[in-house]
Amino acid sequence: MVVELKEYDSASEMAKALEDEISRTKSLLGEYLRRLDDIRSLAEKSKKIREVVMKLAGKKAVQETLGEITVGNLSVILDANPFHELTAIEDVVRSQQERLLALQKAREALKWMDQLGDTEGLKYIVVENDGVPEKILFKIY
């Protein structure tokens, strides 16, 4: 989570920055969704092959340990398989979807600013949390 202060000269400049962020997030989300489809397909194939081999070998599927170790606050997966990657991409997609929703809600909440008209002599200081506006300070200069 990154909190930043950004300064804008007009409501339209702030709206454009928000639109750009929404577009970037949509594009990124689209890329992740394509990867998710590819990995999901690979994970399903991997699962089917594993089930067939286990059945032919006459063995029961054993619950595997994830081969996961924790180093400080970092989780490290050793010998990652398609299921590990699928889980990681699902987490990223969920996060990007939540971010996109927050950006779109912020855009809706800021529509009233279009009616301000000429705001010469006014700066917009915006507190953003991961690129999502949370607070706007009007500063007269």
Regions found by a protein language model. Give the residues of each.
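Extended alpha-helical coiled-coil "stalk/arm" regions
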Residues: 28-70
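Short, charge-rich amphipathic alpha-helices with coiled-coil/heptad character
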Residues: 1-30, 77
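Charged, low-complexity, helix-prone segments enriched in Lys/Glu/Asp/Gln
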Residues: 18-25, 32, 50, 103-108
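Short, glycine/alanine-rich amphipathic alpha-helical segment
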Residues: 61, 65-89
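Short, charge-rich amphipathic segments
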Residues: 21-36, 85-92
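Coiled-coil termination/hinge junctions
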Residues: 42-53, 84-135, 140
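N-terminal secretory signal sequences
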Residues: 2-6, 17, 41-52, 56-57, ...
